[in-house]
From Swiss-Prot:
This is Small ribosomal subunit protein uS11. It comes from Acidiphilium cryptum (strain JF-5). The lineage of its organism: Bacteria, Pseudomonadati, Pseudomonadota, Alphaproteobacteria, Acetobacterales. Belongs to the universal ribosomal protein uS11 family. One of its GO terms (cellular component) is ribosome. HAMAP family: Ribosomal_uS11. Keywords: Ribonucleoprotein, Ribosomal protein, RNA-binding, rRNA-binding. Located on the platform of the 30S subunit, it bridges several disparate RNA helices of the 16S rRNA. Forms part of the Shine-Dalgarno cleft in the 70S ribosome. NCBIfam families: PRK05309.1, uS11_bact. Part of the 30S ribosomal subunit. Interacts with proteins S7 and S18. Binds to IF-3. GO terms for biological process: translation. InterPro entries: Ribosomal_uS11, Ribosomal_uS11_bac-type, Ribosomal_uS11_CS, Ribosomal_uS11_sf.
């Protein structure tokens, strides 16, 4: 008979990475922050939804700030000190996520805006009438 797998939780090893890239995706509905090493391997991540915000509260700047602080704290545990920031998307959490990463104590070397802009591509969705 096969041996049962142990139920003891596996301890996450501490990586020693000094610099990395913070990818901030700020959509209209949520803000996601992923911090990776230079090769693109994810070190930590967080989103407004994973921090307990639901519905329209996920798209607020405060929710983006909380998500960025959480992802940044996890990355600091792995020894990360310098960051390049890549921001994409039109959401409200762009600036506040960037500011939150600065206040944690990261030294920011570059900020890039990677928001995709169509050169007259697909037809956009209809305008909202509220």
């Amino acid at each position: 008979m096969a041996k049962a797998a142990s139920t003891r939780p596996r301890r996450k090893e501490r990586k020693n990475i000094s610099s990395g890239v913070a990818h901030v995706l700020a959509s209209f509905n949520n803000t996601m922050v992923t911090i990776s090493d230079a090769q693109g391997n994810a070190i930590s991540w967080s989103s407004a939804g994973s921090q307990g915000f639901k519905g329209s509260r996920k798209s607020t700047p405060y929710a983006a700030q909380v998500a960025a602080e959480d992802a940044g704290r996890k990355a600091r545990e792995h020894g990360m000190e310098t960051l390049e920031i890549e921001v994409s998307g039109p959401g409200a959490g762009r600036e506040s996520a960037l500011r939150a990463l600065q206040t944690i104590g990261f030294s920011i070397t570059a900020i890039r805006d990677l928001t995709p802009i169509p050169h007259n591509g697909c037809r956009p969705r209809k305008r909202r009438r509220v």
